[in-house]
Amino acid sequence: MYSAVSSRSTVVSSRPLSSSRSLVVSSSYPKMSTASTTYSGVASSGSRISSTRYSTIGSALGGAGGFGTRSSLTLSGNAVISNEKETMQDLNDRLSNYLETVRRLENANQQLEIQIREAMEKRGPSVRDYSNYEKIIKELRDQIYDTTVDNARLVLAIDNARLAADDFRVKWEAELAIRQSVDSDINGLRKVIDDTNLGRLQLESEIEVLKEELVFIKKNHEDEVIALRNQVNSCGVQVDLDAPKGTDLAEIMATLRAEYEAMINKNKDDAEHWYQSKVETFQVETVQNTEALQTAKTELSDLRRRIQSLEIELESNRSMRASLEDTLRDTELRYAMEMERLGALVSRIEAELAQVRTDMQRQAQDYEVLLNAKMKLEAEIATYRHLLGGEDSDTLSLQDALSAMKVSNVQTVQKIVVTTQKLVDGKVVEDSTVTETK
């Protein structure tokens, strides 16, 4: 908050003092005494000058002789003025007293003016010259701005770290989903491998069964061949030559042997061909499954390494985020302490400014009192000079006396201009000015 106090301006207005100033003259002849003068009041209250004993002219002055309650005072030309010499002497004494008082007050006024000027020179720059405070305020503004920038930078870094952590979390979740999918594929391939192994074992068992059956068939065939040969041999000994020519058993056996051998070879070839095709198919599938399994294992190891690196990076980002949050809390704490210190400094400066204003007002009031007293004394001196100068006319009116006693009533206008500025992040967001006139 910056506040400035405008310089004082003095407006002097002239008006009759009939309402604020009165000259009371009373007398009882022939007793004479010196006058006692009292100065009081400031500005509009004026000063009252009373003379307790002053020579008048018989009953023409009306006993009391109150100038404040009459509009005019008429001096009768037929009245006899006695003791004029004593009256003039009394007036001269009073005039000398007034002149001495005026000189004394002028000297006191000059001394007070010098003191006021010195006080203004000493205290004035501290009130109006805010260069020292502006330097401190500028440094504090720079510090606040730097702190705000650092705070914004830290907030941005925290946001970036949070976004990076979110990205890594998304990547980690995606990689985890891929890993789970690969694991499920590997489990499926393992089931396929198990099924393939079972099929291979079944085929091998079937091949063994077929081999045993082939051996059994060969053995039976040999047994049948041997039995047939024995039968043929036994039958050939008892052949009746006269019997009609029968079927050639050797040819039949050869035909049967050829048919059985062809059938056996065909079955053997079909079995071997089927076995080879199945074995080749299972070998191809096994190779493919092995390659897929190896690829899946490689991908799984890569995914594990990537997940491990992502977890390490995530932990580092978490630790960096925690450190940044700690730094942010420390910065906010320092910022709050600095703002509290600045608030205390501003309050102290405002208190000093209020004290300076109070001192200035008090000095101004003292100056006004002295100035009013001086001007009233000058007005009274002018009035007495007018009275001492004498009038040739027989009539002296109170209006003439009051017209000679017109003085300028001093009015002091104090204008206080208070400018309030609201700062946010080193920038002025609100500016208001209040002017107060006293």
Curated annotation (Swiss-Prot):
Keywords per UniProt: Coiled coil, Intermediate filament, Keratin, Phosphoprotein
Marked site (Stutter) residue numbers: 335
GO biological process, one term: intermediate filament cytoskeleton organization
Region (Linker 12): 229-252
GO cellular component: keratin filament
InterPro entries (alphabetical): IF_rod_dom, Keratin_I
IF rod domain ranges (all copies): 84-395
Region described as Coil 1A: spans on this chain: 84-119
Organism domain of life: Eukaryota
Other comments on record: There are two types of cytoskeletal and microfibrillar keratin: I (acidic; 40-55 kDa) and II (neutral to basic; 56-70 kDa).
Protein name: Keratin, type I cytoskeletal 18
Biological classification of the source: Eukaryota, Metazoa, Chordata, Craniata, Vertebrata
